[in-house]
């Protein structure tokens, strides 16, 4: 990925001291992960209009070693900005900082799937909600396809994962 990335980060946690450099290098849009506000949407749209990549953690942060349900914000923002979604999985980063401090080099695996979208949300409010939920599930299954099976979490038995693995030229991650 050769373009600048601005990440949406949860403001309630702030930025941990060891990551203070990240917003300077990448850019950060601070948001409430439970409720996407108008300023987040405006900043996200500005980022995309500038030709930058908007990095979003669909689960609302990194809190579990396995995949969990996505919050609606990632799909909503992708729809609002008319942007394609690039599924990315990161594995092995949870202990990386601790390992670096102890002089141990961590292995971090990043898999990048094929882009898809944009997502179109139209219809009644109820229909839009259903489409957001379905698109959020699709996003998480596309990410699951890039991870080993033991990391699929609540998506473990979803048959679409194998279809996305084939789409990404993976037998299984």
Regions found by a protein language model. Give the residues of each.
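Catalytic core of membrane glycerolipid acyltransferases/transacylases, capturing the structured
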Residues: 1-36, 43
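Non-catalytic C-terminal accessory region of glycerolipid acyltransferases
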Residues: 39-173
């Amino acid at each position: 990925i050769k373009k600048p990335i601005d990440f949406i980060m949860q403001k309630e946690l702030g930025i941990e001291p060891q990551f203070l450099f990240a917003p300077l290098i990448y850019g950060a849009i601070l948001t409430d992960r439970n409720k996407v506000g108008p300023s987040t949407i405006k900043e996200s749209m500005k980022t995309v209009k500038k030709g930058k990549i908007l990095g979003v953690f669909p689960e609302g942060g990194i809190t579990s070693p396995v995949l969990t349900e996505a919050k609606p914000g990632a799909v909503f923002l992708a729809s609002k900005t008319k942007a394609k979604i690039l599924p990315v999985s990161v594995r092995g980063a949870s202990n990386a900082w601790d390992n670096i401090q102890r002089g141990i080099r961590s292995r971090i695996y990043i898999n990048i799937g094929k882009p898809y979208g944009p997502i179109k949300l139209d219809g009644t409010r109820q229909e839009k909600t259903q489409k957001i939920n379905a698109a959020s599930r699709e996003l998480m299954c596309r990410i699951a396809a890039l991870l080993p099976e033991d990391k699929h979490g609540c998506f473990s038995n979803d048959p679409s994962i194998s279809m996305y693995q084939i789409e990404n030229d993976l037998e299984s991650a």
